[in-house]
Amino acid sequence: DYVGLMNAALLLEDPVLVIEHVDLYTSRGQAPVEDYDYQIELGKAKVVKAGSDLTVLTYMNMVSKSLDAVAEAGVDAEVIDLRWLDRASLDWDTIGESIRKTNAVMIVEQGVQGTSYGTWLSDEIQRRFFDHLDQPVLRVHGREASPSISKVLEQEAIAKTEDIVRALATAKQGFGSN
């Protein structure tokens, strides 16, 4: 996705900020072999894993952690990589389709609660899809600590797979008889 995202960003006439997460530098994935002009569609999220019990909205390095947690928890969750995070390009069609199917949402991000993207996203989801939600929007986020002080504190501050697994267990309680 990175190649496609960067190529799409380079062709936009407006200013673009591409955020590269350091944890993704060592990750492996598929890349276009011969199509060096490959692009992902502007404003299009990617359903990484289909599911019917819960919609997991995430981005960057938390995508793989979310997939690991979903597998570990045994929840039939739909995991969506948002890809484009600006308000104008957010893929509300994909998000809405998934929410109408699952009736439950969890936002997974690495950042801390107060200053996070998920704060705005959660609020907007409740405004747009309130009638389709069977439980409150759940959020997994980092702890209230500055990740720039030391590597040890940084590792303690960021959200982990175990945090996602615990939140998935909470979500399962809201499924009713499932």
What are these regions (language model features)?
Residues 1-14:
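Internal gly/pro-rich beta-alpha loop/helix module
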Residues 14-15, 53:
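Short, surface-exposed beta-edge/turn micro-motifs
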Residues 22-178:
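Thiamine diphosphate
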